[in-house]
Amino acid sequence: MANQDFLNEINKRRTFAIISHPDAGKTTITEKVLLFGQAIQRAGTVKGRGSNQHAKSDWMEMEKQRGISITTSVMQFPYADCLVNLLDTPGHEDFSEDTYRTLTAVDCCLMVIDSSKGVEDRTRKLMEVTRLRDTPILTFMNKLDRDIRDPMELMDEVETELKIACSPVTWPIGCGKLFKGVYHILRDETYLYQTGQGHTIQNSRVIKGLDNPELDEAIGDDLAVQLRDELELVLGASHEFDHEAFLAGELTPVFFGTALGNFGVNHMLDGLVKWAPAPMPRQTDMREVTAAEETFTGFVFKIQANMDPKHRDRVAFLRVVSGMYDKGMKLHQVRTKKDVVISDALTFMAGDRSHVEHAYPGDIIGLHNHGTIQIGDTFTQGEMLKFTGIPNFAPELFRRIRLRDPLKQKQLLKGLVQLSEEGAVQVFRPLANNDLIVGAVGVLQFDVVVARLKGEYNVEAIYESVNVSTARWVECSNEKKLEEFKRKNEQHLALDGGDNLTYIAPTMVNLNLTRERYPDIEFHQTREH
């Protein structure tokens, strides 16, 4: 039986990620969340070049230049009686694979929507991913300090496009220059907004009760009447908050505010710690593992190279699923069947590292990795099980990487293999020639690869177009048929970074014809790590 202190530690944990379309304000909201967790004293706004106060979570050189989050940062902070683990995910179009894998390591998501735009393409894609595991979702309608779309319309759009019921928890009073604050439906309180307080925690004036004459005085008679009318309509037409439906991923509580003005973020955080689940069970190939089990298990969902420019290292991010990590404990790496002693695991505050003595289910720890750990690796205290559901996606874009200095072929290969293990890009080595082909989900990834090859491996490379339109991982239980397939299709076959056989098709037509010609061969669009 697990002891009470251990169970208390588990029940305190909340592990969540923020999902949004680029520029909906995700990095800003991350900053403000950390400010409330007292992790940083003054929030640095994400700005273009030239501003020296960069956001805490965008710490890689290229991110600083471009003002976008490229790699997933992990931050832990206390809030109310809980310990919150926040995984910041790249909102930029090109990093969906990294984002996707991060969503396998959380128990809850916060969806940030730009209220002037509504539901955007990237948000739709990410919501599809959360659907695969029915992850509970909280929603923050951002940018109330600008002119926004009608709030009822915004909620309707979320319901119809994302197929999730909305339950408003707070309701906005005006917007743009006329934004006065929000009314908290569950608390029956109005919180008034002050401008110019974005970098600190606001002490909002609170007015109790919707019929309080103080409210009319504070926001003006017209807005007060409008607020009461709107609320009558909203409460009649929207869903009441239902905790079971929220945990099942069927209903989302909706909060309104402005991350830049640091208003409304605390209401969302209050909801998160109150309603989001403590660390959830995870499925393995053998059985389900629950958080309260006493033996340690965990899985690697991301590898980050060179978190410390001073040290040429890589760090594997591991989500603790059950048991407790103790400094110096011996763990079993299931894939390699080797035991390793972990004495220097890290916790993170986006790029600042500190060594950790203990970690509990729901926590994310960093393991130093000298090329022996891969994405999807399971660590246990001896049990031979493997966590499932951490996929690799077939890339959609391909380029050939070419060296400016042909003598650096060895460094190039080393750099590309490391970047592919980290999941930044996928590398394919064709069987028929010495080309190196990289595959990505978005164009920006190629720029990142070239920049990192130069900055971290001192390799000057350029990429050029290549006649590949899609890739599929190939499997066949019949050895003889697989050998025949390989012999006849060598010019279209390659090995990926993990030496898995891959069919690289010049066109979709070619892929479909090959499929018909070889019915015994399986072509997979995703591959479990």
UniProtKB/Swiss-Prot annotation:
Any single Gene Ontology cellular-component annotation: cytosol
Gene Ontology MF terms in the entry: GTP binding; GTPase activity; guanosine tetraphosphate binding; translation release factor activity, codon nonspecific; translation release factor activity, codon specific
CDD domains found in the cross-reference section: RF3, RF3_II, RF3_III
Main location: cytoplasm
Gene3D superfamilies in alphabetical order: P-loop containing nucleotide triphosphate hydrolases, Peptide chain release factor 3, domain III
GO biological process: regulation of translational termination
Compartment list: Cytoplasm
Alphabetical keyword list: Cytoplasm, GTP-binding, Nucleotide-binding, Protein biosynthesis
Keyword Cytoplasm: yes
Domain called tr-type G: residue spans: 11-280
Binding site for GTP: 20-27, 88-92, 142-145
Keyword GTP-binding assigned: yes
Stated family: Belongs to the TRAFAC class translation factor GTPase superfamily. Classic translation factor GTPase family. PrfC subfamily.
Primary role: Increases the formation of ribosomal termination complexes and stimulates activities of RF-1 and RF-2. It binds guanine nucleotides and has strong preference for UGA stop codons. It may interact directly with the ribosome. The stimulation of RF-1 and RF-2 is significantly reduced by GTP and GDP, but not by GMP.
Record-given protein name: Peptide chain release factor 3
Organism: Proteus mirabilis (strain HI4320)
